[in-house]
Amino acid sequence: LFLAQNLGLWNGVDPCAGAAPTLSQAQCANTGVPASQYGSISLSPASQYNALYGGNPNLDPEEVDTLTFGVVIDATDNMQFSIDYWDIEIDDVIANIDPELIVNQCATGGDPAFCSLVTRAPNGSLWQGQSGFVTATNINLGGQHWEGIDLAWAWTVDGLGGTWRTDLIGTYMLTKETSPIPTIPSSTYDCVGLINVQCFPTPEWRHTATATYDSNEWWAVTGRWRFYQDVTYDGTADLIANDNIGDENYLDVSAVFRFMDTHDLVVGVNNIFDEEAPLVGGSLATNANQIAGFWDTLGRYMFANVTFRW
């Protein structure tokens, strides 16, 4: 609401820049490009452009409707299964419209509400210096709708002198819709199964499965499988090879050693086969050429920690 406004950077593409712009001269004129500059505006080599971000004192509060229900089944004394459905709808979402979307909506529709937000530098640039930028301060968006199903399964059995435990937790994503522009229903997009400058990677299905053997004495060992279903790139520029990222699988292993009922030593290796994170173009990346915080960006790595109790 009262967040200070300042210039920042957005990742994407200026469709009116470059020797061969993706939009027509008439469309680019809507964004402030005169005929004399069409085809001569420089593209940002880093795919980064200026935007004015910050608060807005005219915001309304968000409104949320949430529906959840689930079932838990104890199939046997040592096996449990649960399924949960959830549906979340948010109206008047407080966020900003993606600057690239603002430029495209201005260009293709000529709506003053969007075109007034695009300020080009004297040379037509949106990235050279600070005089060219897109105003993308917070507003009340149309809304968001997220819907999915969570599944969980667990099984425990005694054997070989210890206890075996297996479990699986997964999410099936049904809907991840955003309506950024209340007055333009066609601007609504669903991110399930996609990745682009507006959609953080959203696999339709992802899960984590673990298997543990506990000696019930001084040690236990655990294996873990993390799975992310493939996502398809949906955008105007080729930022991913073959326009998709295939299924990603990561295997981890760890062991715990217990000493004197007061000390635990845990050692492990995550991503034991050193699977590399998918490479993406600069406008999709959150860190250089990868998407940090989702797929493993470090490759194989080892860890250890010690816990003391008293």
For each feature predicted by the language model, list its residue ranges:
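C-terminal beta-signal and adjacent terminal beta-strands/loops
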Residues: Q80, D91, L174-K176, R226-D234, ...
